[in-house]
């Protein structure tokens, strides 16, 4: 087995004689296997749920467990392994709280607005469709373009994040990871639609939850007394200080940026309509809110601990620095599975969301002849 020469993210890793945690062949096999497993599961499950209603809104019949795991899995992409960890090293506890609240806030917003939109437009499938019918076509195309652009950028960021992660662990070329993940996800998502996305989200969230618990527990136990607010305060008191101005500016910036963009996430609005009733939607959103908050906060705290232990560590690699300090191959394999599960759960949501907008809003946008199959065009 092979190990990296250092964990600092410094230039040494850019030398020709890199040594990694995993061999490229091992990581490549794992990427292919994990991607294929989710693709086969999605394709097999969605065979019995065909039709436009299942593709767009899962026939409006999703229960509490499936809806909750899907909402959380879709919200938590591979970015959680990098973003909050890095932000905590310069923005302190305020950045972490802002990140967490920004990610979870849409769940609270959807409790109230979700009820209204389901009541006013019970047969809908998207926020943009609702806005077009409620307020006219004046801003419709602009909002549609902005929504698709945001989700496309989100999709690119997710695929890039997991590709960078696996490159860091094994040296696998970025395009190889990205291509495998995209092809497998597109295959089952464009075939099975929202049904396939939600079903695979359920499995992915179970995998994500178990692996996060294991990996964070390992970090906590191996760090000992260093895994505490007291240790962070002794090394970098500004990160926990109420008088540290960047903590407020960073927190507010992250909250506004993350919350505002997620409110236009079509994947969330599809799930609002997919819930079998409003009570299921409400409980699911509340549970999702209280699952997301501690996960983001824990990742941010890990970033502060890592930075306090060694300020020379590249900020976005803090999670891996603490976890892989003993250079364990098994942990590297677990990280690959975690990263792929986080990414695929988010990417399938984004792919189906973008596709659904073409189906739902395509007629009003392109105005083709009445026999046009917008579902086929979207695929």
Residue ranges and their predicted role:
Residues 17-82, 189-192, 205, 211, ...:
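Membrane-interface "cap" regions at the ends of multi-pass membrane proteins
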Residues 40-48, 152-159, 172-180, 184-190, ...:
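Hydrophobic alpha-helical segments and their helix-loop junctions in multi-pass secondary transporters
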Residues 56-123, 256, 268-311, 321-342:
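Membrane-interface helix-loop-helix modules in multi-pass membrane proteins
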Residues 63-71, 105-108, 137-150, 179-181, ...:
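Select transmembrane alpha-helical segments in multipass membrane proteins
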Residues 97-189, 257-258, 339-349:
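Helix-loop-helix module between adjacent transmembrane segments
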Residues 124-132, 193-202, 264-294, 315-318, ...:
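Hydrophobic, small-residue-rich membrane helices and short re-entrant helix-turn-helix hairpins
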Residues 137-141, 152, 356-379:
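Loop-to-transmembrane helix boundary motifs in multi-pass membrane proteins
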Residues 145-156, 207-218, 249-263, 278-308, ...:
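Selective recognition of specific alpha-helical transmembrane segments in multi-pass small-molecule
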